[in-house]
């Protein structure tokens, strides 16, 4: 399950870490904020265990011919995957966007963070989206463009909290302590707006009859709890790493609010996170399905489980 709100808030969260998760930028290594989220180096053993990414074909001389741009897998994994192209869907748990692209929530999204967690963002060129803002704007005006774009995705071990590649003339990023404080404030504001059931959109207009908000699914409720927990975390020392965030399990919900069959922990220390299979309605483990660092092929076990239930129902009748 792998880490972006736009601006400091979104980028602190993946693998919410998100938001660690979605982007790895070249960034200025001297910026203190980046030190908090630097991925560990990949060991030779970890790299040797990587399989060729889907779409890579072997050439006549045994050389790999890769018809796609390769990027590092989400989180702190060490293997390569094909990057998402311009216009393709993207989010916290999807492969990164290609070079020069960023994953943006849709401009009309009321909850950009949730949209990105659900993989409902779009890979767009930096500056094309309405949410885009320069790193300086985001850093100096935490209240402006708070739901901005995500950092550029390069095959790099550094996670740039403020977006984009590094370069001379960029202002130093603010401390991790300040960034987490801004993140906490933004998440709290999102929950407050959710609780209003849409009233904040009425502005000065005459009161309208509002529909009651739809009931939250178990997956959405679990995600809300995780976000609430992050929003109330104690601020770390500004130089202290935020490893405690990695221990959180961020549920992988689909666009309908159901659990995705495959749930995974975030990649860490050069190792892929473990993945397991759950029932899409309840989030409970599917018995017999393995927990592995790879694809447990959950659809096979889910179909088998559903088939067994169907046979049992027929016998009961």
Curated annotation (Swiss-Prot):
A motif (Cell attachment site) lies at residues 293-295. Disulfide bonds join 39-76, 42-78, 50-79, 68-82, 90-103, 97-123, 219-253, 264-275, 277-298. Multifunctional protein that plays a critical role in regulating the availability of IGFs such as IGF1 and IGF2 to their receptors and thereby regulates IGF-mediated cellular processes including proliferation, differentiation, and apoptosis in a cell-type specific manner. Functions coordinately with receptor protein tyrosine phosphatase beta/PTPRB and the IGF1 receptor to regulate IGF1-mediated signaling by stimulating the phosphorylation of PTEN leading to its inactivation and AKT1 activation. This is Insulin-like growth factor-binding protein 2. PANTHER family: INSULIN-LIKE GROWTH FACTOR BINDING PROTEIN (PTHR11551), INSULIN-LIKE GROWTH FACTOR-BINDING PROTEIN 2 (PTHR11551:SF5). PROSITE patterns: IGFBP_N_1, IGFBP_N_2, THYROGLOBULIN_1_1, THYROGLOBULIN_1_2. Residues 1-33 form the signal peptide. GO terms for molecular function: insulin-like growth factor I binding; insulin-like growth factor II binding. It holds the Pfam family Thyroglobulin_1. Interacts with IGF1. Interacts with IGF2. Interacts (via RGD motif) with integrin alpha5/ITGA5; this interaction induces cell migration, adhesion or apoptosis according to the context. Interacts with PTPRB; this interaction leads to PTPRB dimerization and inactivation. CDD domains: TY. One of its GO terms (cellular component) is extracellular space. Residues 216-298 form the Thyroglobulin type-1 domain.
């Amino acid at each position: 399950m792998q880490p972006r709100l736009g601006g400091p808030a979104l980028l602190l969260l993946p693998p919410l870490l998100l938001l660690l998760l979605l982007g790895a930028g070249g960034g200025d290594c001297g910026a203190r904020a980046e030190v908090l989220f630097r991925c560990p180096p990949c060991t030779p053993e970890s790299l040797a265990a990587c399989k060729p990414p889907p779409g890579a074909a072997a050439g006549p001389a045994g050389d790999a011919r890769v018809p796609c741009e390769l990027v590092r897998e989400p989180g702190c994994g060490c293997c390569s995957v094909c990057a998402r192209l311009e216009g393709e869907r993207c989010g916290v748990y999807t492969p990164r966007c290609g070079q020069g692209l960023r994953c943006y929530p849709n401009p009309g999204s009321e909850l950009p963070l949730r949209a990105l967690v659900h993989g409902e963002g779009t890979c767009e060129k930096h500056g094309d989206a309405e949410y885009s803002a320069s790193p300086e704007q985001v850093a100096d005006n935490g209240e402006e463009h708070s739901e901005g774009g995500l950092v550029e995705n390069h095959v790099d071990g550094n996670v740039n909290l403020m977006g984009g590649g590094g370069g001379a003339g960029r202002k130093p990023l603010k401390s991790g302590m300040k960034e987490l404080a801004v993140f906490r404030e933004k998440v709290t504001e999102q929950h407050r707006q959710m609780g209003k059931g849409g009233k904040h959109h009425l502005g000065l207009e005459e009161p309208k009859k509002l529909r009651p908000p739809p009931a939250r699914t178990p997956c959405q409720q679990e995600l809300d709890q995780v976000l609430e927990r992050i929003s109330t975390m104690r601020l770390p020392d500004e130089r202290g790493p935020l490893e405690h965030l990695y221990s959180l399990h961020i549920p992988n919900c689909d666009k309908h609010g159901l659990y995705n069959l495959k749930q995974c922990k975030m990649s860490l220390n050069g190792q892929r996170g473990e993945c397991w299979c759950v029932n899409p309605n309840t989030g409970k483990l599917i018995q017999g399905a393995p927990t592995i660092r790879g694809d447990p092929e959950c659809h096979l076990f889910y179909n088998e489980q559903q088939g067994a239930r169907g046979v049992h129902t027929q016998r009961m009748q």
